[in-house]
């Protein structure tokens, strides 16, 4: 599963042998983006944060070209094209790490990136693993926004049922189906098989 750097996921990976945790490049990128905002505009383009963002952008650009490939072809291209970019990024950050110091947004960004290196490299080893979890986060965004509206759900069972319905709706969307029509189909067809 592709996740942010929340330690619980890494603990779960150690406990569950079949689980592989992959790091999310968007989360890593976000740390550098936030660090860049506190750097004066005049010197921003010469900063380590800016240069790291440009390197991450180059990785994403190359990854975008692989979208229509099979997972096997994507894996080959990861090794040939993208792995050297990722290697160069981590080498660059490690070489400049001491110049940053131990505090501030940029130091946090560098620490996060280096602590997550193992997980951020997972997508290079498997053509089916995406670089980030944006697709998943987009899918749950509506659920998170609607959280206030669902405060009226006052039982565990009600919450579980809401989650099931929401999951079915998101699955329909992910498969290019119209959720309303899909529910209509399910509610018509399921009783026929009971």
Regions found by a protein language model. Name each.
Residues 1-194:
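Catalytic center-proximal scaffold of phosphoryl-transfer enzymes
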């Amino acid at each position: 599963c592709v996740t942010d750097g929340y330690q619980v996921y890494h603990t779960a990976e150690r406990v569950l042998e079949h689980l592989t945790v992959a790091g999310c490049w968007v989360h890593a990128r976000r740390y550098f983006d936030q660090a860049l905002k506190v750097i004066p505009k005049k010197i921003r383009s010469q900063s380590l944060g800016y240069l790291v963002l440009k390197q991450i952008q180059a990785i994403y650009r190359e990854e975008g070209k692989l979208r229509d490939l099979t997972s096997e072809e994507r894996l080959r291209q990861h090794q040939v094209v993208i792995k050297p970019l990722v290697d160069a990024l981590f080498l660059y950050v490690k070489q400049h790490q001491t110049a940053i110091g131990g505090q501030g947004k940029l130091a946090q960004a560098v620490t996060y990136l280096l602590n997550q290196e193992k997980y951020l490299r997972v997508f290079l080893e498997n053509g089916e693993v995406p670089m980030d979890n944006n697709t998943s986060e987009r899918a749950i965004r509506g659920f998170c926004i609607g959280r206030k509206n669902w405060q009226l759900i006052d039982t565990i069972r009600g919450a579980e049922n809401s989650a099931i319905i929401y999951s079915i709706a998101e699955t329909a969307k992910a498969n290019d189906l119209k959720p309303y029509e899909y529910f209509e189909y399910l509610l018509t067809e399921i009783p026929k098989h009971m």
